[in-house]
Amino acid sequence: MTSTPTALSIAQDLLRCPSVTPADAGALDVLETLLKGAGFTVHRVTFSEPGTADIDNLYARIGNTSPHLCFAGHTDVVPPGDASAWTHGAFAGDVADGLLYGRGAVDMKGGIACAVAATLDYLAANGGQPKGSISFLITGDEEDVAVNGTVKLLQWAAERGEQFDHCIVGEPSNVETIGDTIKIGRRGSQSGVLIVDGVQGHVAYPHRAANPVPDIARLITTLNDEPLDHGSAQFQPSNLEFTSVDVGNPATNVIPAQARAKFNIRFNDHHTQETLKALVEQRLAAACGNRIRAHIEWLPSNADVFVTKPGAFTDLVGAAIAEVTGRTPELNTGGGTSDARFIAKYCQVVEFGLVGQTMHQIDERTPVSDLDKLTAIYRGVLQRYFA
């Protein structure tokens, strides 16, 4: 049997592409060459949006029947920061002391490399065809505005008649060690700006003004003090976090006309975006009474809450993890948002990849042994899925 590329070699090829969003820098070419060589039909699709950069995306599929397992992810990376601070070049793909260094090693070129390596090995051992379909849905627009990537690629695929049964997103889901966590959902995210209007005036004549600063402080305290909920079966309690307070006033002898406070809410499945906004607005109105003039400017958000209920698919992935690592993974919904929120509208989706401890950091790195383990886990998923 012909040997197939290792996850390490694929990851190194990807890391050597400096694909800081929106640049692709050849990363999708690496995947296209490998997948075409294994018999996949590969599509490259570019999406545009006014005011944003054009983004190249890749969709590849082999097989045309169900069940259909999709591997999803992104080849774009965040900027490396101070290049001189890296022990090894951010885009060199160096291995030292058993560790693979590079921007994207963990988030998430390493995970993509493992999925590709596992798939190529599975196909080579099974006559070149799955008993169903395998696809790769890869974007170059996840780390920035995320408007010309996965969300549009899914719409494009649906318009072509593509139907997914299950999906694994190779985001770095593990906290401490390979196999400790499967992400089965994510909280929603909604940001806003609390605005309190006052009346500008001289600090020596406060009776002629209305200071919004004490009022916004009271409102911040009120909105922070009462929990939005107490959590649910799969999620921790929703959390409202104020992140800045601004009055735009450089003077010390002028009462400002307005005060603004930015905030973000990470919310669970007790809420939708609309019911959440209504709840916060209701509490704000009660706190303002008839005296304080305040309102909220809600910022656009496409980060809805989602959860894949534990069941046959999570059990299958968990069994593959246990076989390789001996661990029973925790089913978790913590952390920030990811493109899985878009995929959840089309099929059941979980996130399982490498350990996330060094993602976005200087000297981002992963043990080569973790690449081998993750490849073996994905290989076990494929074997079980198409049994």
Swiss-Prot record:
Pathway: Amino-acid biosynthesis; L-lysine biosynthesis via DAP pathway; LL-2,6-diaminopimelate from (S)-tetrahydrodipicolinate (succinylase route): step 3/3
Enzymatic class: hydrolase
Annotated binding of Zn(2+) 1, by residue: 74, 107, 171
Coiled coil region boundaries: none
Keyword Protease: no
Gene3D superfamilies in the record: Zn peptidases
Binding-site residues for Zn(2+) 2, renumbered to this chain: 107, 143, 360
Single GO molecular function: zinc ion binding
Disulfide bonds: none
Annotated active site: 76, 142
Cofactor (UniProt): Zn(2+); Co(2+)
Catalytic activity entry: N-succinyl-(2S,6S)-2,6-diaminopimelate + H2O = (2S,6S)-2,6-diaminopimelate + succinate
GO biological process: diaminopimelate biosynthetic process; L-arginine biosynthetic process; lysine biosynthetic process via diaminopimelate
Keywords: Amino-acid biosynthesis, Cobalt, Diaminopimelate biosynthesis, Hydrolase, Lysine biosynthesis, Metal-binding, Zinc
EC number(s) recorded for this UniProt protein: 3.5.1.18
Any Pfam family the entry gives: Peptidase_M20
Free-text cofactor note: Binds 2 Zn(2+) or Co(2+) ions per subunit.
InterPro entries named in the record: Bact_exopeptidase_dim_dom, DapE_proteobac, Peptidase_M20, Peptidase_M20_dimer, Peptidase_M20A
Family membership noted in the UniProt record: Belongs to the peptidase M20A family. DapE subfamily.
Subunit structure: Homodimer.
Function field: Catalyzes the hydrolysis of N-succinyl-L,L-diaminopimelic acid (SDAP), forming succinate and LL-2,6-diaminopimelate (DAP), an intermediate involved in the bacterial biosynthesis of lysine and meso-diaminopimelic acid, an essential component of bacterial cell walls.
Protein's name according to its UniProt entry: Succinyl-diaminopimelate desuccinylase
Native source organism of the sequence: Rhodopseudomonas palustris (strain TIE-1)
